[in-house]
Amino acid sequence: MTDAYQKAGVDVTAGYEVVARIQKKVGADNHNIGSFGGQYALEMAQYQKPVLVSSTDGVGTKLMVAFAADQHATIGIDCVAMCVNDIVAQGAQPLYFLDYLATGKTDPDKIEDIVAGVLEGCKQANMALIGGETAEMPGMYAAKHYDVAGFAVGIAEQDALVTGETIQAGDVLIGLASSGIHSNGYSLVRKIFFEQNNLTVASQLPELPGKTLGDWLLTPTKIYVEDLQPLLQQRVIKGAAHITGGGFIENVPRMLPADLAAHLTLGSWPILPIFKALQQYGQLAEMEMYNIFNMGIGMVLAVAPEAAPAVLAQLNAKQEQAYQIGTVQKRQQAAVELVTAK
């Protein structure tokens, strides 16, 4: 059967090697890798009324940049980040993660790089990788192409969930810096740089010093678990928005009651060079940028005005870049208004 499968384009031996390499990286004591299902022992005694919070996501067409650059070591971090930032924004403590990777041809070295990134992401999020799936699918994907998705599960006390329900006019909005574009908007990014301007991943732009364009674009998505967990334990976060696809305009309203709006103060945080380059090379309007990209802020928190100074001090004491970027007001028109500093 192995020979027949091999002739059909599926390399079973390479698949076995991948499992062996992953087991070695994860650790011999983790018996979930290679088993039929992942297991996680939950200590229920420490919870009164626990709620499980889950999320699934992928990395989108950022993968196309990784293919072009043949750099895959940070894609796994992106995959974990996209899932875990969503659940921590709801007040959950991450528990465990599973990954799914489909490829046209099994390349053990490449898959090892990807899974190493997943493990690094799980380490940053303080969660366990308890299993996953690698599927070789010739004819579905090109030989050197793959797709990756992740599944994260976390837990929170029911009365500690961050729902946004207690947000009110006058509350302060705090922005946590992003590491770059993160993992959204790459279809437009690739069109601007690679199609409209005929650049490559090896290009070096004066607006983006020190690294190639590919390196700038493959900067891994920031994981906010370590920053937010102490604040969640203190229960000072009223609402949180993970700034992903749709930028501020789509994501900030997701945490707000319908009668409230976010007033974001332009100039209250630094815009990263990659966004300035995108706007310049793509000739995009400013509002369009805020409607697509995170613009240097990957997570927005809503806190009471009296709590804001301590929250900012606590974040910045950890060498985190956090900024007071606006306030919550009664909604008059749009759910997000960009205002100029007075």
Swiss-Prot record:
Location of the protein in the cell: Cytoplasm
Keyword set includes S-adenosyl-L-methionine: no
Name of the gene: purM
Reactions the enzyme catalyzes: 2-formamido-N(1)-(5-O-phospho-beta-D-ribosyl)acetamidine + ATP = 5-amino-1-(5-phospho-beta-D-ribosyl)imidazole + ADP + phosphate + H(+)
Protein name (database record): Phosphoribosylformylglycinamidine cyclo-ligase
Keywords of this entry: ATP-binding, Cytoplasm, Ligase, Nucleotide-binding, Purine biosynthesis
Taxonomic superkingdom: Bacteria
EC category name: ligase
Enzyme Commission code(s) on record: 6.3.3.1
A molecular function (GO) term: phosphoribosylformylglycinamidine cyclo-ligase activity
GO CC terms: cytosol
Pathway named in the protein's UniProt entry: Purine metabolism; IMP biosynthesis via de novo pathway; 5-amino-1-(5-phospho-D-ribosyl)imidazole from N(2)-formyl-N(1)-(5-phospho-D-ribosyl)glycinamide: step 2/2
Family: Belongs to the AIR synthase family.
Single GO biological process annotation from the record: 'de novo' IMP biosynthetic process
Species whose genome carries this gene: Latilactobacillus sakei subsp. sakei (strain 23K) (Lactobacillus sakei subsp. sakei)
Entry-linked Gene3D superfamilies: PurM-like C-terminal domain (3.90.650.10), PurM-like, N-terminal domain (3.30.1330.10)
Pfam families the UniProt entry points to: AIRS, AIRS_C
InterPro entries given in the database record: PurM-like_C_dom (IPR010918), PurM-like_C_sf (IPR036676), PurM-like_N (IPR016188), PurM-like_N_sf (IPR036921), PurM_cligase (IPR004733)
